[in-house]
Amino acid sequence: YKRQLLADPDQTDVVVRHLWRSIPGEDPKATLISDPVLLALPRLRRLIAENGDREIERVQFDDGEEIAISRFPEQAVDEVVSNAFIHRDWRLPGPVVVEQTYRTLKVTSPGPLPPGVTVDKLLTTTSVPRNNRLMAAMRTLGLAEESSRGFDRMWATMIRTGRDVPEVFATESHVQVVLAAQQPDTTFIKGLRKLSERYGEAVIGSVATLIVLWHLNFAPLITVATAARKTQLTALEVEELMGVLVELGLLDSVADASEWTLSGEARKLLGRGQAGDLATVSIQEWIEAKLLDGESLRSADIADQTGVSVAEAGRILRHLRSLGRAQIDPEGPPRGRGTRWIRA
């Protein structure tokens, strides 16, 4: 392990393979790095920055401050690259492979996830290093921390810059993390600044809160099941988190259900308009969120909980059926007030 970290590898021992494509499908420009990890890491970061650290958007805040949004956030890149080296299985042959285009950054490292870690618990499980000596050495050199918080920072950095969270794929032979440049949501970025000023950075800066806010930036509500899946918390932890956010005035509870929406003030600060009744398009999203969570709905249920008419609820359900997103529950009545709809 010390050899990989500090010593020069053999001439044929490639530590990193960087593949750059300016156009999808073209033959990549390959750069092979055979340096020890201490030199390979900064060299790889520079290589990624040369191709991807280009400004794709600028955001000007109300106080006049202006910031540049790069194609791939520097902190997210640092975390994904460091994790690839720190947690790879050095007993397995093969380099860390970085595939980069103008739109995506894909980092693949040999070996499975560390013991005890699964893809659906990356944010909430402290990983156990495969080799304590290697981890201790990298920690001493500032390349790793005591607790595994790399994925937290990846998630938070992508959301803070108005992008979707990374995708992670894991098998017994490799772990792959994909960052997508996308078009940054500048309204959301500016809204986060306002929310931080209003509710405090400690609240808004939490990765779980950021995940909830990113979801509510596009959907009218979030259910306990969706929140648990996206934050990787337990249902009980989600209820506790949401309770705090409701007390602070950031979220509102929906009736007596385990569902939440942005408060009127938070909606305004986030740039999603004024408080008030949900628009029809939002009600459609609300229905889809319910169906995706495995619930069955009647037109009367929708009318009771959203304030639209039963007829309008029925129209939206039929529209979702035409889109292939909803269907009548085959185990219930095919028509009438008792008709229930489920996910298609």
Q: What role is predicted for each listed range?
A:
Residues K2-A344:
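C-terminal regulatory or interaction extensions
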